[in-house]
Amino acid sequence: MSDLKFSIITICYNSSKTIERTIKSVLAQSYTDFEYIIVDGASKDNTMDIVKRYEPLFEGRMKWVSEPDKGIYDAMNKGIRMAQGTIVGIVNSDDWLEPNALQILADEINQDPSNREKILTGEVVFHYEDGSTQLYPTTYERYEYFAKRYRMGLNHPATFVPRSIYDRIGVFDERFKLYADADFIIRCYEAGVGVHFIHKVLSNMADGGASNVRSRRELDDSLLKYKKHCKTKSEYLKYATKARIMWFLRYFVPEWYVRLYRQQHNKK
C-alpha cells in the first residue's frame, strides 16, 4: 500500500550518550516511507548537535522541536500531535529498532489490511548493563493476563499504534509520571481495540530507562492507575494494598532478585 506511512517519535533530554544509536536505527530502516519526529526537552548537553548532524541524511523526513516540556508523556503527546503518518511508533532515546522493523510491519498490513486499524506489537530484546540479554515475547494470552490485572501487557518499544486509535481512545494521560503507557494500553483493552501480535523482534531496549528506576513515583502511578481502572472499591483496595507492600519490600530486596523476579514474571 503506497499510502502506508509511519511516524517514528523519539523523545529525549540530555541523551547524548544514547541517541545516536537510536537515530542510526531509524535511518537504517529498509522501509523508507516514514517521518522521524524528535521531541527534545531543551537538552543542556550536545543532544541537539547530534540530531542536527544527522538531519540532512533523512532527506526531509526528519522534524524536531527542542523546548521545555512538562514530562515524558507531555513530550510523547507533543510528538503524536505532530505526526502525519498512518501508524505511530515511539522509540525512546535509549531504544533502537531492528533494521527491518518497519518492513515487517508493512508486510503484516499488506497481507491483512484489517491490521491497519489494530495495534501492532512485536518482541523486544532487553539489554542489561552487564551485557546479558532477555527476550520479551508477545502473545495474546500474556496481554490479556496483564491487562485484566491493570498492568502493561505489551512491549511498548515494539508497539505501533494507528493514528486513528489515538484519535478514538485519546493520547497519554499526563497525570502519570511513569505508567501512562500502561494506562493507554489498558484503555485500549477495555475499549476492545484489536491487537495484532508479531512473533519477531522489532526493537531493543536498554536497562536504565525512566520506567526502570525504583522510586516513590512508581507507587503513586500504581495507585492512580488502580483508582482509574478498578471497577469496585474492594478491587481497588486489593490492588492498592498489594502495590504498597511490594513497593516497600523492594527497598529491602537485592537487585539480582528483582531482576530474577522480573524475568520469571514476564514468562507468564
Short names for language-model regions:
Residues 65-83:
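Glycine-rich, basic loop-to-helix element that forms the pyrophosphate-binding segment
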Residues 1-28:
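N-proximal low-complexity "stem/linker" segments adjacent to membrane-targeting elements
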Residues 46, 74, 95-108:
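Acidic donor-binding/catalytic loop of UDP-sugar-dependent glycosyltransferases
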Residues 33-42, 63-67:
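Short beta-strand/loop segment that forms part of the nucleotide-sugar
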Residues 88:
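Short aromatic/hydrophobic "clamp" motif used to bind/position activated sugar donors
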Residues 139-218, 222:
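Conserved nucleotide-sugar donor-binding catalytic segment
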Residues 32, 40-49, 92:
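A conserved acidic beta->alpha catalytic loop
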Residues 100-134:
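Conserved donor NDP-sugar-binding/catalytic core segment of glycosyltransferases
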